[in-house]
From Swiss-Prot:
The keyword Nucleotide-binding applies. Allows the formation of correctly charged Gln-tRNA(Gln) through the transamidation of misacylated Glu-tRNA(Gln) in the mitochondria. The reaction takes place in the presence of glutamine and ATP through an activated gamma-phospho-Glu-tRNA(Gln). Its EC number is 6.3.5.-. Keywords: ATP-binding, Ligase, Mitochondrion, Nucleotide-binding, Protein biosynthesis. Subunit of the heterotrimeric GatCAB amidotransferase (AdT) complex, composed of A, B and C subunits. InterPro entries: Asn/Gln-tRNA_amidoTrfase_suB/E (IPR017959), Asn/Gln-tRNA_Trfase_suB/E_cat (IPR006075), Asn/Gln_amidotransferase (IPR018027), Asn/Gln_tRNA_amidoTrase-B-like (IPR003789), GatB (IPR004413), GatB_Yqey_C_2 (IPR023168), Gln_synth/guanido_kin_cat_dom (IPR014746). NCBIfam families: gatB, PRK05477.1-2. This is Glutamyl-tRNA(Gln) amidotransferase subunit B, mitochondrial. It catalyses: L-glutamyl-tRNA(Gln) + L-glutamine + ATP + H2O = L-glutaminyl-tRNA(Gln) + L-glutamate + ADP + phosphate + H(+). Belongs to the GatB/GatE family. GatB subfamily.
């Protein structure tokens, strides 16, 4: 996939796919997300809201859920409040009046024969979901109109010196890309409340189908987005951001693998009428001109149970449409397809229904939902600090980079953990964020854990950082202490107790350090290196310090060791 950054790297990226003929195509992706609302009971009945497939089948089913004649719906107030929270979080307009409608279709796991939804008068509409994409996540699949080097090509350089200098610049560029983020947003069309269906199980030995109605009637939030996304990478990041926001608000647990958060894709493509030889400006002009070709017919893709599979489905479907047009001369028709995670392909299910097919009409058994300004204000005041505001505050208050704040906010529990550690002024925020993001996260990743399951509390990590700051231990020793705290701290010991038991306190006595330095330089084996040092090979200074560290297991205060070694070398010179 080629990327074109029009008018500078901070502009939205135009991400293109190359077709079989070499022509570049633009991809358009829209998302519809269904999130099961966290609530004790279902949307229209008092039955327990069941989100786990492990629950006993048909245990949490009321008469209304089973569509027994004469039963009436009773709206769950908490589910409605959850929808308002979500609308406020994305700066949508929360409408003072909304309506439920019946959407008719016939599945064996939909007892009513219709779904209660909000097609024409949703709880909220408009707004946008803001997200940030690490620049390093945008990877070119080939050269072409624009491509950044993803790997270092050593064959371009004749001499070792040229290669080393180029490699150094390349590494610096890659490090900067890792820290840089691209800010984007996707517009929200509407946020509506609706009922979930039951669950059909077709995987039986006798080819029969059984129906579990535990899920039937569970409250869903349908979040419909405008087709603003231009790559599977963007779509994946939007899903991660939405998943994090839903969890942050405690609206949905966001577990796609368990079906509590589901996503439908709408994918279409259009040609740029330009080939690989086109420059960045030509591509930008072609794609933004009024004469640009419209996007083709969209295809809906269902059945993705993870963000990774959603991204795979988006890319496959875009390539399928391009190949259909270029190689077969065919047309893309509006249809619904499913994604096969095993083959990585989308497969036709049915032609796409329109609004007329569903025969929408107002729900006669439910009055309109009416929200006062006072209610909306009360819900707003009870909401937690939103991720976007939290990122901005972390950057301003602690002088973090956009990338650092992005990682802290997107990892559940990481931002409060960081702020607890950094609470005391003696702990520099840059030191703290490095220990959290690099060292602590490294151990958590190794055991597939998260902040909530970390055996090292924020207070304990802060105490460890204090030992570095006051010179009790070196940064290198601190890493060893953290490893013991993480994997072998039973019974529980403080960082200081571990340091004292292991004898790892840093040597800070100048006379003791001076004796260690003299021992290294007075060693007959050091004469050759000393001669080389005086002849200009000053990088051997690091070797001498390394020998000092080796003598005492790395416990010497590095700054004192450097200073004293420099003094002794000057004495030797005289």
């Amino acid at each position: 996939m080629a990327q074109v950054a029009a008018n500078g790297a901070r502009q939205p990226l135009l991400q293109l796919l190359r077709g079989p003929s070499g022509k570049l195509w633009e991809v358009c992706i829209g998302l519809e997300v269904h999130a099961q609302v966290l609530s004790r009971s279902k949307l229209m009945s008092g039955s327990a809201a069941s989100t786990l497939s492990s629950a006993r089948p048909n245990r949490n089913v009321s008469f209304f859920d089973a569509a027994l004649p004469g039963t009436l719906p009773v709206i769950n107030r908490e589910c409605v409040h959850q929808a308002i929270r979500m609308g406020l979080a994305v700066d949508a307009t929360v409408h003072p009046r909304s309506l439920f409608e019946r959407k008719h279709y016939f599945y064996c796991d939909l007892p009513l024969g219709y779904q209660l939804t909000q097609q024409r008068a949703p709880v909220a509409s408009g707004g946008a979901l803001h997200f940030e994409l690490p620049e390093s996540a945008v990877v070119s699949e080939h050269g072409g109109a624009h491509s950044d080097e993803a790997t270092f090509d050593a064959s371009k350089y004749k001499s070792r010196k040229e290669k080393n200098e180029a490699l150094k610049k390349w590494k610096a560029k890659q490090a900067k890309k890792q820290q840089d983020v691209i800010s984007r947003s996707v517009r929200i069309t509407r946020i509506q409340i609706e009922q979930d269906s039951g669950k059909s199980n077709h995987d039986l030995e006798d080819d029969s189908t059984v129906v579990d109605l535990n899920r039937a009637g569970t409250a869903l939030l349908e979040i419909v987005m405008e087709p603003d996304l231009r790559s599977p990478v963007e779509a994946g990041q939007v899903m991660r951001q939405l998943q994090h926001l839903l969890r942050h608000l405690d609206v949905c647990d966001g577990n796609m693998e368990e079906g509590s958060m589901r996503c439908d894709l709408n994918v279409s493509v259009r040609p740029t009428n330009l080939g690989a030889e086109a420059d960045v400006e030509s591509l930008h002009n072609a794609l933004t001109a009024r004469t640009a070709a419209p996007f083709g017919e969209r295809v809906e893709v269902k059945n993705m149970n993870s963000i990774r599979n959603m991204m795979r489905a988006a890319e496959y479907e875009a390539r399928r449409q391009i190949a259909l047009i270029e190689e077969e001369g065919g047309e893309v028709h509006r249809e619904t397809r499913s994604f096969d995670a095993v083959t990585g392909e989308t497969k036709r299910m049915r032609s796409k229904e329109g609004a007329k097919d569903y025969r929408f009409f107002p729900e006669p058994d439910l009055p309109p939902l009416v929200f006062s300004e006072k209610l909306i204000q009360e819900i707003s005041e009870r909401m937690p600090e939103l991720p976007e505001a939290l990122k901005e505050r972390l950057c301003a208050q602690y002088d973090l980079t956009s990338y650092e704040s992005l990682v802290l906010v997107n990892e559940p529990g990481a931002a409060p953990y960081f702020e607890t550690v950094a609470a005391q002024n003696s702990r520099p925020s840059k030191v703290v964020v490095n220990w959290v993001l690099n060292d602590l996260f490294g151990h958590l990743k190794a055991v597939n854990g998260d902040i909530a399951s970390s055996p090292v509390t924020a207070t304990e990590l802060g105490a460890l950082i204090d030992l570095i700051q006051d010179g009790t231990i070196s940064g290198k020793i601190a890493k060893d202490v953290l490893e013991l705290m993480f994997y072998e701290n039973e019974p529980k010991k403080t960082p200081l107790q571990i340091v004292e038991e292991k004898g790892w306190k840093q040597i800070q006595d100048p006379e003791e350090i001076r004796a260690l330095c003299r021992a290294v330089l007075d060693d007959p084996k050091a004469k050759k290196n000393l001669d080389a040092y005086w002849k200009g090979k000053t990088q051997l200074f690091g070797f001498f310090i390394g020998q000092v560290m080796k003598q005492c297991g790395g416990r010497v205060h590095p700054e004192l060791a450097n200073s004293i070694m420099q003094e002794i070398l000057e004495e030797h010179k005289q």
